[in-house]
Amino acid sequence: MGKKAKVKVKVKKRKLKLKRIFFCLIFLFLIGGIFYLVKKIPITNIYIIGNNIVPDKEIISSAGIDNYPSFIDTSKKDIITRLKRNNYIKEVKVEKKLLSKIYIYITEHKVISLSNNKILLDNNTEVENTYNIHNVPILISDISSIKEKYTKSISKIDDDILLKISQIEYTPNDVDSERFTLYMNDGNQVYITLGKVTKINKYNSIYSRLEGKKGIIYLDSGDYIEVKEE
């Protein structure tokens, strides 16, 4: 009798082990299936924020996600690396949200001026005018001798004021070798030096003092206005 009881106990233990193995396999199969299905979930929405020059479509294509690939397999690092190959793009931040949404935050280089269809950016790099940018000051002088300082200084001009400048001419005199003339879209003329370039950011206030007349604004020295005779 004792031997039979031992045999039954062994059989029961073996059955319990088999059940455990079976349930473990089922569990692993379910986990694997869920992971496979989740991995197959594609990107459903792509949001591009902060770009003004580079089009959304180009950003998505350059990032390598224009075919809306697997959300999980999409690498944020890869997107950043690909996008920063574009000379116009300064910084990129990527966020993945809600298991299917990609947010791409773009910081572009500031466009300083245009010369011979070459765009000068705020990092002192000249690039091709790939995006046909025209609402930017045209540089009509050779500034090679002070290019770096010119770029650094002009980049301090507020964007809305930069849009008001039609042309920039390098016009040094005996007093200041860093003197420039800004020809405004409204017909006014501004003399300024690189060291005092931020004064132009108050242009709207200065312009209001002209009361609709045209004039020459001297911000290089004296800060006064010479009204043009009509």
Each predicted region: which residue ranges?
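N-terminal positively charged amphipathic segments used for targeting/anchoring
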Residues: 1-38, 174-230
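Periplasmic polypeptide-binding modules associated with outer-membrane biogenesis and secretion
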Residues: 18-27, 33-37, 41-54, 61, ...
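Extracytoplasmic
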Residues: 41-43, 54, 87, 97-101, ...
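Soluble periplasmic/extracytoplasmic beta-strand elements of cell-envelope proteins
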Residues: 45-49, 93-95, 101-107, 119-120, ...
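Second-shell loop/turn segments in exported
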Residues: 48, 65-69, 136-144, 188-194
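Solvent-exposed coil/turn segments that connect beta secondary-structure elements
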Residues: 51-53, 88, 97-99, 107-111, ...
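Extracytoplasmic/secreted envelope proteins and their assembly/folding machinery
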Residues: 56, 60, 76, 80, ...
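Extracytoplasmic segments of membrane-associated envelope/inner-membrane machinery
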Residues: 104-177
